[in-house]
Amino acid sequence: DRKMLLAAAERYLGRIMTENADALAKAPDSVLTLVPDAAGQPAILWGDSRLAVFAKGKNLLQPEIKFDRSIKDMAPEASQKVIDRVKLWVDAMKDKHLQGLVKIDALANEPETPAAVRALFAQIVDAGGILSRREIDQAIRALDNDMRGHARRAGLVFGALDIFHHALMKPGAVLWRTALFAAHDAEPMLEQAPDNAVHLKQGTFASAGHASRLGFRKIGDEYVRVDMVERLIKQAHEARQQGAIFAIDPALATSLGLSK
């Protein structure tokens, strides 16, 4: 009798899991989320159920997707449906939030891309799309004007202090970059800054390196998003060219929340 009850329970659970797999396969992308789990690992959830976590993979943009035991214990057909759906979702989210970085990675591996540009792109991808100009100075010096144009058409901004892709400041891009770095470095995900924040007070980040990974640069005792730093530098440069004393645009200062 016990064996019969266990067999019946297994059949019932198997049917439920199969139905869940079918539902997930047909569900929109919005039912899945990427969040840090209790250990800080980048985890993929369906509702409250953890399906998988990211781990170090081939490179930053290609993490290993480690599926939970519960998925592996499903019937093979149901398990494969879940695995395929999650992989499709990861690809779709990278294309949505990190499209510029994915494009740069592809260009870095195309023979038609000039060698000096490929070298620059490879370093940019390894850095997750944001890199201090000082760290990449030699690669920049190797570019002529045409090559710089090639890089700009791919979305790169050559700032006075940082080189970055303009689309990587959006909240979704920051979340995915943070998750990919956590997987690649086998470290917990960094705590996210508030969505669309451009200025943060001292103590927000454990290090300048953490700040850079979230798109911020330390200015004095505070942190400013790298694209906003470039706007400030551009305003100062334009004022200097006109022989005027630089005064920050009040609207920009207000948006940044800068201290006096």
Q: Can you describe what each PLM-predicted range is?
A:
Residues D1-S259:
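Acidic, serine/threonine- and proline-rich low-complexity intrinsically disordered segments
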